[in-house]
Amino acid sequence: MTKEEIIEAIENMTVLELAELVEELEEKFGVSAAAPVAMAAVPGAQGGEQQEEKTEFDVHLAEIGGKKINVIKVVREVTGLGLKDAKALVDDAPTNVKEGVSKEEAEEIKSKLEDAGATVELK
Protein backbone atom coordinates (compact mmCIF):
# COMPACT_ATOMS: atom_id res chain seq x y z
CA MET A 1 0.00 0.00 0.00
CA THR A 2 1.48 3.38 -0.99
CA LYS A 3 1.37 6.58 1.04
CA GLU A 4 -1.10 8.03 -1.44
CA GLU A 5 -3.45 5.07 -0.93
CA ILE A 6 -3.23 5.46 2.86
CA ILE A 7 -3.98 9.19 2.62
CA GLU A 8 -6.91 8.48 0.32
CA ALA A 9 -8.29 5.89 2.76
CA ILE A 10 -8.00 8.39 5.64
CA GLU A 11 -9.74 11.08 3.56
CA ASN A 12 -12.72 8.76 3.09
CA MET A 13 -13.12 8.04 6.84
CA THR A 14 -15.71 9.66 9.08
CA VAL A 15 -14.73 11.65 12.17
CA LEU A 16 -15.76 8.75 14.41
CA GLU A 17 -13.64 6.30 12.40
CA LEU A 18 -10.67 8.69 12.56
CA ALA A 19 -11.01 9.01 16.35
CA GLU A 20 -11.01 5.21 16.69
CA LEU A 21 -7.97 4.97 14.40
CA VAL A 22 -6.07 7.50 16.51
CA GLU A 23 -6.92 5.57 19.71
CA GLU A 24 -5.71 2.29 18.18
CA LEU A 25 -2.47 3.91 16.98
CA GLU A 26 -1.86 5.40 20.43
CA GLU A 27 -2.31 1.98 22.05
CA LYS A 28 -0.23 0.10 19.48
CA PHE A 29 2.75 2.49 19.55
CA GLY A 30 2.46 3.72 23.15
CA VAL A 31 2.22 7.39 22.17
CA SER A 32 -0.23 10.21 22.73
CA ALA A 33 -1.77 12.34 20.00
CA ALA A 34 -2.51 15.11 22.52
CA ALA A 35 -0.84 18.44 21.81
CA PRO A 36 2.07 19.18 24.16
CA VAL A 37 1.26 21.51 27.03
CA ALA A 38 2.77 24.97 26.58
CA MET A 39 5.31 25.81 29.26
CA ALA A 40 5.64 29.20 30.91
CA ALA A 41 7.94 31.47 28.95
CA VAL A 42 11.49 31.64 30.22
CA PRO A 43 12.95 35.16 29.79
CA GLY A 44 16.17 33.84 28.21
CA ALA A 45 14.31 31.67 25.71
CA GLN A 46 12.21 34.59 24.48
CA GLY A 47 15.31 36.41 23.22
CA GLY A 48 16.21 33.52 20.91
CA GLU A 49 12.79 33.58 19.30
CA GLN A 50 12.97 37.33 18.73
CA GLN A 51 16.28 36.95 16.93
CA GLU A 52 14.77 34.44 14.50
CA GLU A 53 11.90 36.80 13.77
CA LYS A 54 14.12 39.83 13.22
CA THR A 55 12.84 41.90 10.31
CA GLU A 56 15.21 44.88 10.28
CA PHE A 57 18.95 44.60 9.79
CA ASP A 58 21.96 46.89 9.89
CA VAL A 59 24.57 46.44 7.16
CA HIS A 60 27.92 46.77 8.94
CA LEU A 61 31.07 47.41 6.90
CA ALA A 62 33.72 45.57 8.94
CA GLU A 63 36.73 45.92 6.60
CA ILE A 64 37.30 47.70 3.30
CA GLY A 65 39.64 45.16 1.75
CA GLY A 66 42.07 45.98 -1.05
CA LYS A 67 39.60 47.56 -3.48
CA LYS A 68 38.66 50.79 -1.70
CA ILE A 69 37.46 52.58 -4.85
CA ASN A 70 35.08 49.74 -5.74
CA VAL A 71 33.72 49.73 -2.17
CA ILE A 72 33.15 53.52 -2.33
CA LYS A 73 31.25 53.09 -5.62
CA VAL A 74 28.96 50.47 -4.08
CA VAL A 75 28.42 52.57 -0.94
CA ARG A 76 27.41 55.51 -3.15
CA GLU A 77 25.03 53.28 -5.10
CA VAL A 78 23.25 51.75 -2.08
CA THR A 79 23.12 54.87 0.11
CA GLY A 80 22.64 57.63 -2.45
CA LEU A 81 25.50 59.60 -0.85
CA GLY A 82 27.82 61.85 -2.80
CA LEU A 83 31.43 60.89 -3.48
CA LYS A 84 32.85 62.84 -0.53
CA ASP A 85 30.33 61.44 1.97
CA ALA A 86 30.67 57.88 0.66
CA LYS A 87 34.48 58.11 0.90
CA ALA A 88 34.21 59.43 4.47
CA LEU A 89 31.88 56.57 5.39
CA VAL A 90 34.26 53.98 3.94
CA ASP A 91 37.25 55.64 5.64
CA ASP A 92 35.41 55.38 8.98
CA ALA A 93 35.12 51.57 8.70
CA PRO A 94 34.16 49.62 10.72
CA THR A 95 30.80 51.37 10.52
CA ASN A 96 27.18 50.81 9.51
CA VAL A 97 26.51 51.49 5.84
CA LYS A 98 22.73 51.25 6.13
CA GLU A 99 20.45 50.69 9.12
CA GLY A 100 16.96 49.27 9.59
CA VAL A 101 16.63 47.62 6.17
CA SER A 102 14.72 44.47 5.26
CA LYS A 103 16.50 41.13 5.17
CA GLU A 104 16.31 40.98 1.37
CA GLU A 105 17.77 44.47 0.93
CA ALA A 106 20.46 43.79 3.55
CA GLU A 107 21.48 40.56 1.79
CA GLU A 108 21.62 42.38 -1.56
CA ILE A 109 23.80 45.19 -0.16
CA LYS A 110 26.05 42.67 1.59
CA SER A 111 26.49 40.75 -1.65
CA LYS A 112 27.39 43.89 -3.62
CA LEU A 113 29.90 45.05 -1.00
CA GLU A 114 31.50 41.62 -0.76
CA ASP A 115 31.79 41.47 -4.55
CA ALA A 116 33.62 44.81 -4.33
CA GLY A 117 36.10 43.27 -1.86
CA ALA A 118 34.72 44.41 1.51
CA THR A 119 33.99 42.34 4.60
CA VAL A 120 30.38 42.87 5.68
CA GLU A 121 28.24 41.71 8.60
CA LEU A 122 24.48 41.85 9.08
CA LYS A 123 23.42 42.85 12.57
Curated annotation (Swiss-Prot):
Location of the region described as Disordered in the Swiss-Prot/TrEMBL record: 98-123
UniProt GO BP: translation
Pfam family, one: Ribosomal_L12
Keyword flag Nucleotide-binding: no
Superkingdom: Bacteria
Chain intervals with Basic and acidic residues compositional bias: 100-115
InterPro entries referenced in this protein's UniProt entry, alphabetically: Ribosomal_bL12, Ribosomal_bL12_C, Ribosomal_bL12_C/ClpS-like, Ribosomal_bL12_oligo, Ribosomal_bL12_oligo_N_sf
Ranges that cross the membrane: none
GO cellular component, one term: cytosolic large ribosomal subunit
Presence of the UniProt keyword Ribonucleoprotein in the record: yes
Record-level Gene Ontology MF annotations: mRNA binding; structural constituent of ribosome
Keywords: Ribonucleoprotein, Ribosomal protein
Oligomeric form and interacting partners: Homodimer. Part of the ribosomal stalk of the 50S ribosomal subunit. Forms a multimeric L10(L12)X complex, where L10 forms an elongated spine to which 2 to 4 L12 dimers bind in a sequential fashion. Binds GTP-bound translation factors.
Chain's role: Forms part of the ribosomal stalk which helps the ribosome interact with GTP-bound translation factors. Is thus essential for accurate translation.
Matching NCBIfam families: L12 (TIGR00855)
PANTHER family per UniProt: 39S RIBOSOMAL PROTEIN L12, LARGE RIBOSOMAL SUBUNIT PROTEIN BL12M
Protein family membership: Belongs to the bacterial ribosomal protein bL12 family.
Name recorded for this polypeptide: Large ribosomal subunit protein bL12
Record organism: Halothermothrix orenii (strain H 168 / OCM 544 / DSM 9562)
Taxonomic placement: Bacteria, Bacillati, Bacillota, Clostridia, Halanaerobiales
